[in-house]
Amino acid sequence: TLKQEVERLEELLQLPTRPDYRYEIARVVSRDFNSWWQHLEIRKGGKHGIPTGAPVVFSGGVVGRIIEVHEYTSTVELLSNSHLRMAVIIAGDNRPMSYRGSGFQTLQNPVGIAEYIPNDINIDDPSNPPRIITSGMGGVFPAGLPIGYLRRLRPGASGMFQDGDVYLDKRLARLTEVAVLIAVEGNYQ
């Protein structure tokens, strides 16, 4: 049945229960080599209740957000896209920082950039780097979704903060199925 298929896919994607959202599982149907780290197309659209601005996730965390909705497909702006920006925090530290995609990537490890990192943050153990998660600010991404790991720090332009490289999940390069988070109430505009 359809319900069993949804349960199978949710288990496959290992998505946590979120009472304020429902998951709409979608297959990745198109990804252009010229914009591999910028956008992808999914086979769910307006007919399936997909709203513009909705977060897109997989078991490794954030994939991106819906930027264009058609009748049966939608375009996802990826986490690695330099136009995608969001408020983030380091897990266990509630001070907000800014995240943005770094734009051009190779087909290896996708990397983003964290900005406004407090100067007292260090990477003490490279084998256990600080984990970057969504802060919940901004109204699009709920709090606590994994983004990646903070790997390299450097002085920020103002000298008051640091900037750093955020290593994203390698599986972002080969996604075949994702989940769109749709708020039970409200919209994303």
Where are the regions that the model predicts?
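A secondary-structure micro-motif
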Residues: 8-189
